[in-house]
Amino acid sequence: MTLIKSISGIRGTIGGTIGENLTPVDVVRFTTAFACFLLENREQTASSQSDSSNLQDADRSMMRMVVGRDARISGSIVNRLVCSTLQSMGIEVIDLGLSTTPTTEMAVIQQHADGGIIITASHNPMQWNALKLLNNKGEFVSGEEAKRIVLLTESDEIQYATIDKLGSYTLYENAVKDHVDAILNLPLVDKNAITKANFKVILDTVNSTGALALPVLLKELGVNDVTVLNGEMNGVFAHNPEPIPENLAGICNAMSRSNYDVGFVVDPDVDRLAIVTENGTLFNEEYTLVAVSDYVLQHTPGNTVSNLSSSRALKDVTDKYGMTYTPSAVGEVNVVEMMKKTNAVIGGEGNGGVIYPELHYGRDALVGIALFLTFMAKSGKKCGQIRAQYPDYFIVKKKTELDSSVDIKALLGKIAEKYSNYQVNRVDGVRIDFEDSWVHVRSSNTEPIIRIYAEAMSESVADNIASKLMSDIRELMA
């Protein structure tokens, strides 16, 4: 069984058994449930203003949804199922076709939609696909909202629209241009400086929609010398699509053979960004957010946020400017919530996810590229020189499977108690901060697994810390 329902939506491998994999039936059920959820919200708002007996039909006629997808092989099939289901619910559909996750998020705002569905399994292999759900702000639904949507998938009282109330369909192909235009209008994006720098850039777009969006962005920024690796939008990923070191040998080798200034790698839906220096060495995806934040904080003093499993390098940069860094629970929706609470000017996740609220509250590789190129252009520094400004921290990641009978909450409590003499954060699992290192222990939302993240000034120390926590877990379960 691969079908996983979580706070970000539903995902699974294509085909197989209904309810166990991502089948057409599951796509229709989940799309219907999300539509019902949005209709419920609309009706609750409207009921205080109208007592019309035909309220539901009126509400449906006003509903608008944006749909976008990455280039996965199954994407066009899932897209047709999603759009047809929404129309059958009486909802107007704005279909972006091939798009990116941040572009779809932006389109929800720009099209004044009630919500959106992104058809992408992000960095998962090509046999996977997923539906990710957006509210009317172009942000992911909350955990509580996701629970309600899952409950609605089991309802047998859903009413589809009658023939005279079916929703309309519009294919909108300018969403990427709209997104790029909004980025170019940001005060901290300096097109003139980037154009004058005459950068030579190489991209790895993993045969997905980065190949659509990134060349458009770079052209508008005045970058004319661009090489694209894996630029066919056929959904056949040339390598494991997660932008982590073991998957990026191709672009690193290409850079070492030519005179590029910088390389950018994105995942299939373009919400994560990895950077490669002019020497063909990895910038380290944990430092994508760090460098972009450094540039933003130079010009816009303010607070920062990243999740508890992200590098402490962001805190170092934030401290440099006398501002406040706040960690959040893992998950984009949690990062965004904390950013709003603390009025953060920049935030994100250490997996290369940059969230710049001046544009929108969502991870966005396009705005990350625009801000980073501006940083390079205005500082006059090479990519590698920018990376050298920051301390070298090393993160080690481990996981251990648990028997389904294990009380994970109690286990995490025992770990917190064992390390109570140190600084302990219980917002999401247990994070323990030592003098110059930390470890984060948390349970998976979908599997009986404990994940362990440790960071230190050397890889061996980080590995020792993670291994010690693995040993503690085994001991506490005995």
Residue ranges: model-predicted function:
Residues M1-S84, S88-M89, S168-F199:
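An N-terminal, well-structured beta->alpha segment
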Residues T13, N129-S258:
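Gly/Ser/Thr-enriched, mixed-charge loops and adjacent short helices
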Residues C36, D51-Q56, S61-W128, V216-V276:
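N-terminal small/polar loop signature for handling phosphorylated ligands or for N-terminal nucleophile
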Residues V67-R69, L203-T205, T277, E358, ...:
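Short glycine-centered, acidic/aromatic-flanked micro-motifs in structured strand/loop junctions
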Residues L96, R148-D181, N185, T277-G350, ...:
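Proline/glycine-rich low-complexity loops and linkers
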Residues L133-N136, A274-E278, I355-P357:
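Short beta-strand-to-turn element immediately C-terminal to the catalytic PLP-Schiff-base lysine
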Residues V262, T300-A478:
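Phosphate-binding and adjacent anionic-ligand microenvironments
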